[in-house]
């Protein structure tokens, strides 16, 4: 009885009594299979032959003996590892080179463990705690001070000021007026109720007013131009009897020369320089 023939799919050499490899149900001699189908090792660039173990990670292949940490050269076979810039690193080397350090305990935050980030620093989840109650803050609201981070209840208990207007806690910013704290959004003109936090303002009987309201309600009016005399920014004004003038408005009613620092004469509600007033039946 004739023995059936069994050939390599590629080179057609007989495979009887020889090792072979099946690929898509087709037989290949070992040399043809290695030449045609073998992957190339990422490390040594040699083919990974059919008799060798082929280790694959993200489409790249290694011989078992080449699958090592690129920094310490220890084998990564059946060990945890991580990739950094296409380099494979064992857990220890990755931690030393790439992992963040906890801002509190200064120890490495291991890959895969949960970490908290705040203002560019990192913490172990168990190290990111309220400075007062020592409970983990996690993703809950917090308030930061130079002395540390605080959960909202502890901050309110230890540090918070209460707004003089709404009586609620001031958690950040705020304004002090008459030694009393205010939310910026609560510090309003007592007349028109607009916010004063970015405005110049005046006060009357301990109440704040924007300049428009204060001038309208309380400022004296210039006897010449009738506009308010505010006295802001060191503005100068002249008082005589029961009348006031802006210094730039205190001029002779006839020739308009400035009378600031000069002698003057009056007639009814007019003021004159001595020259112009000499021909007028003046009061002085």
Curated annotation (Swiss-Prot):
<dbReference type="GO" id="GO:0005634">
    <property type="term" value="C:nucleus"/>
</dbReference>
<keyword id="KW-0862">Zinc</keyword>
<comment type="function">
    <text>May be involved in the regulation of spermatogenesis. Stimulates CREM transcriptional activity in a phosphorylation-independent manner.</text>
</comment>
<feature type="domain" description="LIM zinc-binding 3">
    <location>
        <begin position="161"/>
        <end position="220"/>
    </location>
</feature>
<dbReference type="GO" id="GO:0003713">
    <property type="term" value="F:transcription coactivator activity"/>
</dbReference>
<dbReference type="GO" id="GO:0045944">
    <property type="term" value="P:positive regulation of transcription by RNA polymerase II"/>
</dbReference>
<dbReference type="Pfam" id="PF25076">
    <property type="entry name" value="LIM_FHL2-3_N"/>
</dbReference>
<dbReference type="InterPro" id="IPR056807">
    <property type="entry name" value="LIM_FHL1/2/3/5_N"/>
</dbReference>
<dbReference type="InterPro" id="IPR001781">
    <property type="entry name" value="Znf_LIM"/>
</dbReference>
<dbReference type="GO" id="GO:0030018">
    <property type="term" value="C:Z disc"/>
</dbReference>
<dbReference type="Pfam" id="PF00412">
    <property type="entry name" value="LIM"/>
</dbReference>
<feature type="domain" description="LIM zinc-binding 4">
    <location>
        <begin position="223"/>
        <end position="283"/>
    </location>
</feature>
<feature type="domain" description="LIM zinc-binding 2">
    <location>
        <begin position="101"/>
        <end position="160"/>
    </location>
</feature>
<protein>
    <recommendedName>
        <fullName>Four and a half LIM domains protein 5</fullName>
    </recommendedName>
</protein>
<feature type="zinc finger region" description="C4-type">
    <location>
        <begin position="8"/>
        <end position="32"/>
    </location>
</feature>
<dbReference type="GO" id="GO:0008270">
    <property type="term" value="F:zinc ion binding"/>
</dbReference>
<keyword id="KW-0677">Repeat</keyword>
<feature type="domain" description="LIM zinc-binding 1">
    <location>
        <begin position="39"/>
        <end position="100"/>
    </location>
</feature>
<keyword id="KW-0479">Metal-binding</keyword>
<comment type="subunit">
    <text>Interacts with CREM (via the third LIM domain). Interacts (via second LIM domain) with SPAG8.</text>
</comment>
<keyword id="KW-0863">Zinc-finger</keyword>
<dbReference type="InterPro" id="IPR042947">
    <property type="entry name" value="FHL5_LIM2"/>
</dbReference>
<keyword id="KW-0440">LIM domain</keyword>
<keyword id="KW-0539">Nucleus</keyword>
